[in-house]
Amino acid sequence: MGEAQVYGLEITPHAVRSLKKLKRDRALLRRLDAAILSLAQEPRPPGCRKLPSRKFNNLYRLRVGDWRILYAIEEDRIVVIILDVRRRDQAYRDT
């Protein structure tokens, strides 16, 4: 049996700013961090959804409660790029 491929993780400055705004809600931040880290092992986990986008070929979203992690997968570089973390009502603008 072969080992599962581990993807690298990159996080955009915009996503970092979004996460910093949540620093008061430590429980939510822990859940989001765990979900982001799990994408390195499984970039297409159950419940993720591929989104249509003009900017990215492989744009996905992952639900974490009322929040959405928006990310792209670059298969040629074996990397997951965290683009943003948004509340559900804001998640699908400008993708």
Predicted regions span which residues?
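Short coil/turn residues that cap or connect secondary-structure elements
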Residues: 23, 27, 40-43, 55, ...
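Conserved short hydrophobic interaction patches
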Residues: 35-38, 88
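Basic, amphipathic "hinge/linker" alpha-helix immediately C-terminal to the N-terminal HTH DNA-binding motif
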Residues: 11-15
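Enriched for short, Lys/Arg-rich terminal
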Residues: 1-8, 20-21, 27-30, 64-67, ...
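A short, surface-exposed loop/turn module that caps and links secondary-structure elements
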Residues: 37-62
